[in-house]
Amino acid sequence: MVDRLANSEANTRRISIVENCFGAAGQPLTIPGRVLIGEGVLTKLCRKKPKARQFFLFNDILVYGNIVIQKKKYNKQHIIPLENVTIDSIQDEGDLRNGWLIKTPTKSFAVYAATATEKSEWMNHINKCVSDLLSKSGKTPSNEHAAVWVPDSEATVCMRCQKAKFTPVNRRHHCRKCGFVVCGPCSEKRFLLPSQSSKPVRICDSCYDLLSTGEMTACQSTRSDSYSQSPKSSLNDASDDDDDEDSSD
């Protein structure tokens, strides 16, 4: 089915429309063999709060961006190679329902669909695309992924020392290894995580100690799936993705 659509006029036209919606700031998406499988609006759990994002699933990449004008204009394009993607379902809790984790070596995050059916369709299609890619390349699924960041709203005090209260002056930081929200004194060290950056990145003292002694898997297990067990914030929308990163770090 996918191979048959690859060179069809309809597929080429659909991809061209997506390119036009992102404009000159977006990357070209039309390449031989690429097929647009589906698209839709998902709620992405960003650092500050959940936000609506437009997602496009291709047979080899997942693309998403900010919605400026629905079906007409998007910005801040992100492209994720599906070959490195793994996904895990998230239990429903509060206003956040029908969600799953999208995990990659460079970045991991949670998204939520409007209905359980939509969630199932997205997950099935993503898994099928990943499986087909790995089958063709002969590669094995990636077992390394970046931590999912705990949203700011879920931590009023540092998740490491459990003492420092966050204020406009004592601001929040995120450990790039475990994803915890931590204070400045608990995250003064940096460590090179090649899958995330070519430069050393901010990590918490706990992860630094484990990484320095070579216990990287132990460090990851401290994060575990605590994200899916922590309380969730209410749904909101915003116009940009600036708060996905610690801009000052």
Swiss-Prot record:
Q: Which SMART domains match?
A: FYVE, PH
Q: Alphabetically list the UniProt keywords.
A: Endoplasmic reticulum, Endosome, Membrane, Metal-binding, Protein transport, Transport, Zinc, Zinc-finger
Which parts of the sequence bind Zn(2+) 2?
C175, C178, C204, C207
Q: Where is the PH domain?
A: 35-131
Q: Which protein, by its recorded name, is this?
A: Pleckstrin homology domain-containing family F member 2
Tell me, what's a Pfam family for it? PH
Domain text: The FYVE domain is important for binding to the endosomal membrane.
The record's subcellular locations are: Early endosome membrane; Endoplasmic reticulum
Which species expresses this protein natively? Gallus gallus (Chicken)
Q: How does it sit in the membrane?
A: Peripheral membrane protein
